[in-house]
Amino acid sequence: MSIKKVLLGLLTLAVTVGLSVGTTLYVLSRPELLTRHFYAGEMAAVVSPATLKKYIDEKATNYVLVDLRSQGEYEKEHFKTAVNIPAGSMSEAQLVAMFAKLPKDKEIIVHCYSAYCTLGRQVGQALSRHGIYVKELTVGWSELRYHWDLWNPGAGVDDGQDYIVTGKADPSNAPIIPCTVGEFGC
């Protein structure tokens, strides 16, 4: 190989890397671009309580709501339409296997204990490493269960009781596998 070809290859590589780094530095130096990028990502990854209420009210079939809390907490009370995948007691491999069984043509929405619980974010991050993408409800069980009207303006005197059920998961929705304590949790 001639010196000319080696130099041309190095120059091409340098220009490519330079453009890539330059573009990144340009974006990082422009607050409006950072803000736009942040909100685009945020909106792609979250679902509001009002949207969930609308889906339940309209009996929408374009989504699956996944309750990440423990099986016992799910059986005590959970939102209508929710299936239970108790992420806090699963390894990443088990979690991926469970979510891989969910319909690919539906929006998958996860929720955990509260808005301050990071379980939903941990699950979303782990699944994204395996090409599975979910959205997170912007508030958790505690906020919606006890302050439904606060998170659903215009709901009137609705206290959310019409959206809460008890009992075991419908086995036709999503299988629940027994597991040992794993790596996920608040």
What are these language model-derived features?
Residues 71-88, 101-103, 107-110:
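Mid-length scaffold segments of soluble, non-membrane domains
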